[in-house]
């Protein structure tokens, strides 16, 4: 199973949704970076369940514990192990899923591949696996800020057909966190909340889009041809549960433009830096960061596990129906924001270290 990610800044996540706990081991973090459990906890609190009326009611504090790699608040350049204990499992809610597959969930494919699966909570296919990613992402964010001043802000761009109007150049974390749906558009956010609540009462679910911007990313990050920066960002974000699409810059909308309309014209700013007047490229050209803001969008499907009765089959192929009894998000988008931010941070941190290792000699 592919549970590791990265080259120089490398993470390996572990644990199942209803096991003893989940966590991450981080290898390659440089020494003497100041980091605390409180800084990691801040990010984990943004993704934890039970945080609002529009998220899963599963009650988990998701309290992190640093087991190794940090002494007196500073990293040692040794593996950093972080664990979060599971506290609020209700495995009996998954008894029907022992034999019946959830439509559009990983149950059937895990069985087909491995011949065995952790039924309760979905095991490694559960969003609880992302706890390790978000914890590692907190460290990557801190390293990026300290070394290069990079700032990463994600937010909910769209839920179903409700789309917020947000400027990625100016949006702030405070604006994002001012509403439980994490959409900083004050006009559309209440409508999103009402829609999620209504769909949740029906036992159904919703999908949408998270947009994320990384500001002040240094030029030169990315390794053509197969490790292009946008390719690694796409892989990282598409490895998150429930993802179904990825865009950078103009994305698919760029196919409706001509070259002269789409090209980002160069100019030299007052500081003598080469810039672009527009940013349809989304901060990369030729797979390498160009110094402009990196702007990506990630599409998340509606949550597969719903209370509505659905047609399915058992693991022996017999027709049956299934209505889930577990506690699940009616919409993953509000909790997905810190997950997307974490994956962007992990990719940028890894490429920053690779760039310094490869090109800092000259």
Swiss-Prot record:
Keyword Lyase: yes
Free-text remark on how the cofactor is bound: Reduced FMN (FMNH(2)).
Requisite cofactors: FMNH2
Entry's EC annotation: 4.2.3.5
Enzyme class: lyase
UniProt-listed GO biological process terms: amino acid biosynthetic process; aromatic amino acid family biosynthetic process; chorismate biosynthetic process
Catalytic activity line of the entry: 5-O-(1-carboxyvinyl)-3-phosphoshikimate = chorismate + phosphate
Binding site for FMN: 124-126, 286, 301-305, 327
UniProt keyword annotations, A-Z: Amino-acid biosynthesis, Aromatic amino acid biosynthesis, FAD, Flavoprotein, FMN, Lyase, NADP
GO cellular component term, pick one: cytosol
Listed pathway(s): Metabolic intermediate biosynthesis; chorismate biosynthesis; chorismate from D-erythrose 4-phosphate and phosphoenolpyruvate: step 7/7
InterPro entries: Chorismate_synth, Chorismate_synth_AroC_sf, Chorismate_synthase_CS
GO MF annotation list: chorismate synthase activity; FMN binding
Binding site for NADP(+): 47
Biological role: This reaction introduces a second double bond into the aromatic ring system.
Subunit structure: Homotetramer.
NCBIfam families: aroC, PRK05382.1
Family: Belongs to the chorismate synthase family.
Name of the protein this chain belongs to: Chorismate synthase
Annotated source species: Synechococcus sp. (strain ATCC 27144 / PCC 6301 / SAUG 1402/1)
